[in-house]
C-alpha cells in the first residue's frame, strides 16, 4: 500500500487498490488440496451421506464475499473513475459452523450432522475487514448474502460436475 501511494505521488498516475476478504464463486477449484474453504465445503456436502467433517471447533469467525460482488465493485470503480484504496467485505461475519450449516441448507442437505475434527487447528479466531470507506462511495451497494451466493455456486457446481 505504501509503495503504491509513493508511486502515485512520484509519477502522478491514477491508481487504486482493492483489498477483498475471503472470496468464493462459481469458478473456484474443487480438487482436493487445491480448493478454498467454501468450494471444498460444497464438494464435501455434495458427497456426504450422513455427516460433514470440519476442522477445529467451528467457532472461528470469517467474512466471505461472493466473487461477483467484487466484480461489480471493480466495474463501478472503473466506470466512475474512482481513485482510492478500499477494503471490501460484507459487514457480517459467520462462524465456520454457521457457514457449514448455510452450505448444508443451500445444497439441500440440511439434515447432515457436523463432525468437528478437534485434532485440526481453528486458526485465527476472527478476521474482519471494515468496508465503511467503500460504502461511503457506493452508498446503494448490496452484497450478495452468503445463503444466496452459496446456492448459486452449488447450482453451478452440480451442473458442471453432474456427480449425481
Report residues per predicted region.
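Active-site Tyr-X1-5-Lys
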Residues: 1-21, 37-49
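Conserved sequence/active-site signature of Rossmann-fold short-chain dehydrogenase/reductase
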Residues: 23-25, 37, 70
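C-terminal substrate-binding subdomain of Rossmann-fold SDR/epimerase-dehydratase oxidoreductases
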Residues: 47-164
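Short beta-loop-alpha junction of Rossmann-like oxidoreductase domains
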Residues: 26-29, 133
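Short, solvent-exposed loop/turn segments at secondary-structure boundaries
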Residues: 28-33, 125
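A short, flexible beta-alpha/helix-coil linker loop
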Residues: 22-26, 60-61
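Short-chain dehydrogenase/reductase
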Residues: 1-2, 31-39, 63-64, 93
